[in-house]
UniProtKB/Swiss-Prot annotation:
Origin organism lineage: Bacteria, Bacillati, Cyanobacteriota, Cyanophyceae, Synechococcales
Organism of this sequence: Synechocystis sp. (strain ATCC 27184 / PCC 6803 / Kazusa)
The entry's keywords: Glutamine amidotransferase, Transferase
InterPro entries cross-referenced by the UniProt entry: EgtC, EgtC-like, Gamma-glu_amide_hydrolase, GATase_2_dom, Ntn_hydrolases_N
PANTHER family per record: GLUTAMINE AMIDOTRANSFERASE DUG3-RELATED
Protein name: Putative glutamine amidotransferase slr0199
GO molecular function: transferase activity
GO biological process, one term: ergothioneine biosynthetic process
The UniProt record lists the keyword Transferase: yes
Domain Glutamine amidotransferase type-2: 28-299
Length: 304
């Protein structure tokens, strides 16, 4: 079987009003897993439309042809929670000679991975390479803020706490979005100190609050953004598929498949042909606490 997944139809039309706005932006590809311990190479390398294949032959990118500006893998070890591990490189993922061995050695019940297609003029260096990690979280982002340096760069930084401001080491809009999420997460911790279900709901709430802030900032500064995000804390993954102007980048999920029993996969594109792949709805947040506990929340429509 080839790398194309014929049983799954694209969730986003490739021709639409406003598509020309996206031509100068490049989209990354994301992958997340939660479930029974799994070697990352089983999703990064083995499937017919694996993350490796998506790096050079993506099927549903709204712009760009290659994801060759670096990659990253972040994973949790149950014995070392809540501190995740990272492996990143600015090489194209297919050029790294260590990742095949590392991804075959690791076993993890929660990991995320990413291949990058950098938006010019952002630098291709390790500080800009995802996943980002802070406070026991892993973060990957596929999307952009239009004209970030001249639109939301200063407004976003002005909103951040000192801790989140100092956390930023690179120049990407992605890292600034993560910093905003961290601040919202800290506020939730302060307001819900005795909530036993706090951990199950806080990541989704912090992500939603951050998206609403971005919507308002984009409106104020006459710009737009897209944000497909994966957040993981080792016990759960929270994802979103969101854009303030269509089309949104593609995002899918699959639970308890024959090829991956006891697990949930979230990916920019289906890794293999399976009728059970589900496209995340537009403007939605996906909260995965286990393969049997998955919730989808569609946010109020704010697309321009």
């Amino acid at each position: 079987m080839g790398s194309h997944c014929p049983l799954v139809s694209p969730s986003v039309g490739m021709i639409s009003a406003g598509r020309q706005d996206y031509q100068k932006f490049f989209m990354c590809r994301l992958l997340g897993y939660l479930g029974q311990p799994l070697r990352p190479e089983q999703l990064i390398y083995r499937p017919e439309h694996s993350l490796i294949v998506q790096s050079y032959q993506p099927q549903e990118m709204t712009a760009g042809l290659l994801n060759a500006d670096g990659f990253g893998l972040g994973w949790f070890d149950q014995e070392s929670l809540p501190n995740p591990y990272l492996y990143k490189n600015v090489l194209p993922i297919w050029s790294d000679i260590n990742l095949p061995h590392l991804s075959r050695y690791i076993q993890s019940s929660c990991f995320v991975s990413y291949v990058r297609s950098a938006t010019p003029p952002l630098a291709v260096d390790l500080t800009n390479c995802q996943p980002f990690t802070e406070e026991g979280l892993l973060f990957v982002h596929n999307g952009f803020i239009n004209n970030f340096r001249t639109t939301l760069y200063r407004p976003l930084r002005n909103l951040l706490s000192d801790a989140s401001y100092q956390f930023i080491h690179g120049t990407t809009d992605s890292e600034h979005i993560f910093a905003l999420i961290l601040d919202n997460l800290r506020r939730l911790r302060q307001t819900s100190p005795g909530d036993s279900d706090w951990a199950k709901t806080s990541l989704g709430k912090a992500l939603e609050a951050s998206l609403l802030t971005l919507v308002e900032l984009a409106r104020q500064h006459d710009t737009f953004f897209s944000a497909n995000i994966l957040l993981a804390d080792g016990q759960r993954i929270v994802a979103c598929r969101y854009a303030s102007r269509q089309p949104e980048p593609s995002l899918y999920w699959l639970a308890n498949s024959e090829r991956c029993p006891g697990g949930v996969i979230v990916a920019s594109e289906p890794l293999f042909a399976d009728q059970k792949w589900q496209a995340c709805p537009s403007q939605s947040i996906l909260v995965i606490n286990s393969p049997e506990a998955i919730a989808v929340k569609v946010l109020a429509n704010s697309v321009a």
